[in-house]
Amino acid sequence: TPATAREIARQIGIWTQEDSDKNIITGPAFEALSDEEAAKRVQSLKIMCRARPTDKQRLVQLLQSQDAVVAVTGDGTNDAPALKAAQVGLSMGDGTSVAKEASDITILDNSFSSIVQAVMWGRSLYRNIQRFLIFQLTINVVACAIVLIGSLIGMGSPLTITQMLWVNLIMDTFAAGALASLPPSWSVMRDRPRRSGEHGDFIISKSMAGNIFGTGIFFTIVLIAALLILQKDG
């Protein structure tokens, strides 16, 4: 019943005193809504009780139509349509074989805390990849810029082939190892989920691109100035 579902949600921290009837709906009431009405309602929903398999599947599809990344957990045969429709379907280790086949991941220890920990590790790894890309692309921007500018102003190539190989092979290898070994942090759980679909987030964000080109331009100016000074003194 809605009262039972509300009490369970309150005990696990989903339902709060600020929530109202707009945050809960039953399966029959959800089915009676048009697609336009349901699309507006799903953003505020916290509880859906007495839901049929088609109701769960429709909820997933409506969220996906709004560029949401949807994960669904379930252990029964009636959860299979929603598990298959979601971007990530998670079945319980003790669940039915139908649920496991429809899901992408099976939680062997049947613990929801494992989902949170897996998300934390995945987000931390994604952030480490972004850190490496900032380092790698900044170096490449600077290296290309000083070689190009050096040739244009008649200095020749400031970097030899050996130096370029050193930068791209030796330095990058150690940097990749260092950045990849950074431990996961729970702070990543405060980040908003990345968008998917046609308007999804690219791994290089606008702030990262600004950081790469801003830092690259700064170091290019410093290195060209140093080369000009050394050439003049020499």
Question: What is the predicted role of each segment?
Answer:
Residues 83:
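Basic, alpha-helical nucleic-acid-binding regions used in initiation and control of genome expression
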Residues 1-7, 69-70:
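Substrate-recognition element of Asp-dependent hydrolases with the DxDx(T/V) motif
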